[in-house]
Curated annotation (Swiss-Prot):
GO cellular component: cyclin-dependent protein kinase holoenzyme complex; cytoplasm; nucleus
Gene Ontology molecular functions: cyclin-dependent protein serine/threonine kinase regulator activity
Family: Belongs to the cyclin family. Cyclin F subfamily.
Superkingdom classification of source: Eukaryota
Protein name: Putative cyclin-F1-1
SMART domains assigned to the protein according to its UniProt record, in alphabetical order: CYCLIN (SM00385), Cyclin_C (SM01332)
UniProt organism field: Oryza sativa subsp. japonica
Length: 369
């Protein structure tokens, strides 16, 4: 009698391979901490409008070059030649979408929310301390790049429609929730690093109420934002404008300096009146002046950003003035008593090389860009 054949075992379903965890994000340079010196005063209110409006001109996009194996992509940051598009079928649409979203009133903070919505209950110094706390919070948990910019964007929009008390614990909860919400938007792996209970525990709430308090605040913030979370920030535009940069040391220094200038502008109440693309372009202008020491703008950059150097005059001068005051204050605090004075550039480093003010480059520019 033939032996009975055993049934074949069912195939084992293997779980799908996990995606590689992203590399540790770049840690931004630390922003100043409270108490803040006199240079942290808000920007003066602009005349004749809520915020600078970019020139009404058609954004020039570099045409697609013929596909040739010997046609290199131009990566020099000082080149004036036409650059090929990285994603030709969608480059125009991406550019148009970003520009439309940044000018959408529904996704912009109120120009004077401290004076109107907050009614004087919150000062520019209190807001600056919230931004500094949010920066420390995001760096402590090593959250994704761009989290601080988006969190500040959420905070300003939230404060534009929601009156807040001056309770320090409540303001910390608002700031921490903005960071938590922004981090989840920027990186899908955020919950591997931090959750609502961890957010509330660091804010001083007890174990019985901490998760509930963060969830309630997150719901309130989402409602205040109208569930519109994807508006571009200055970080978005710095990455967009430098997308043609290579991996060279100079290009990396320029991008890092541009992000440092953009992040530094978050501390000062008033920069939110500038469009994010203007803040980003001005940050690149000052970064080139800081790193290269010459030629902060070019026709290539004017075509890429859509702004001439003269269009950036107001934001560049405001940003440079705040950066110089912050650097001077930091230098005075760190200089030993009786030490001889040395030159300070906009990044706070000691140099003997004098730096020409940015507005002189703009005024002396004889070109159309």
């Amino acid at each position: 009698m033939a032996a009975a054949r055993l049934p074949s075992p069912a195939p084992v379903a293997h779980p799908p391979a996990l995606r590689a965890r992203p590399l540790a994000p770049h840690l931004y340079a630390a922003l100043p901490r409270a108490p803040y010196p006199a240079w942290q005063e808000p920007l003066p209110l602009p005349e004749g409008g809520d915020h600078p409006v970019p020139p009404k001109k058609k954004i020039k996009v570099a045409p697609l070059l013929p596909e040739r194996a010997d046609q290199p992509v131009v990566t020099s940051n000082s080149a004036t030649t036409t650059r090929p598009q990285l994603c030709a079928p969608y480059d125009d649409e991406i550019e148009a979408t970003l520009r439309a979203m940044e000018t959408n009133p529904a996704e912009r903070p109120s120009p004077y929310f401290l004076e109107t919505t907050q009614g004087g209950r919150m000062t520019a110094l209190v807001r600056a301390s919230m931004i500094a706390f949010m920066d420390e919070f995001s760096r402590f948990h090593e959250l994704a790049d761009g989290t601080l910019q988006r969190a500040a964007y959420f905070l300003d929009r939230y404060l534009s429609v929601t009156p807040e008390s001056d309770d320090a614990l409540q303001l910390r909860l608002v700031g921490a929730t903005a960071v938590f919400l922004a981090a989840k938007y920027e990186d899908q792996y955020t919950l591997r690093k931090i959750d609502a209970s961890m957010v509330a525990a660091r804010r001083g709430y007890t174990s019985e109420t901490r998760h509930k308090m963060v969830s309630i605040m997150e719901t309130e913030m989402l409602a205040a934002l109208g569930f519109n979370l994807g508006g571009p920030t200055a970080y978005t535009f710095v990455e967009h404008f430098t997308r043609y940069y290579g991996d060279g040391e100079e290009e990396e220094l320029l991008k890092e300096a541009a992000h440092r200038f953009a992040d530094g502008s978050l501390l000062t109440y008033g920069f939110h009146r500038y469009l994010p693309s203007i803040v980003a372009a001005s940050s690149i202008f000052l970064a080139r002046l800081d790193v290269l020491g010459h030629e902060p703008w070019s026709q290539d950059l004017a075509e890429l950003t859509g702004y001439k150097a003269i269009d950036l005059m107001g934001c560049v001068c405001d940003m440079e003035e705040k950066s110089r005051r912050a650097a001077a204050q930091h230098h005075l605090e760190s200089k030993p008593a009786g030490a001889a004075g040395v030159g300070i550039n906009s990044s706070g480093d000691d140099h003997t090389r004098p730096i020409r003010p940015a507005h002189l480059y703009i005024v002396s520019c004889r070109c159309s860009w």
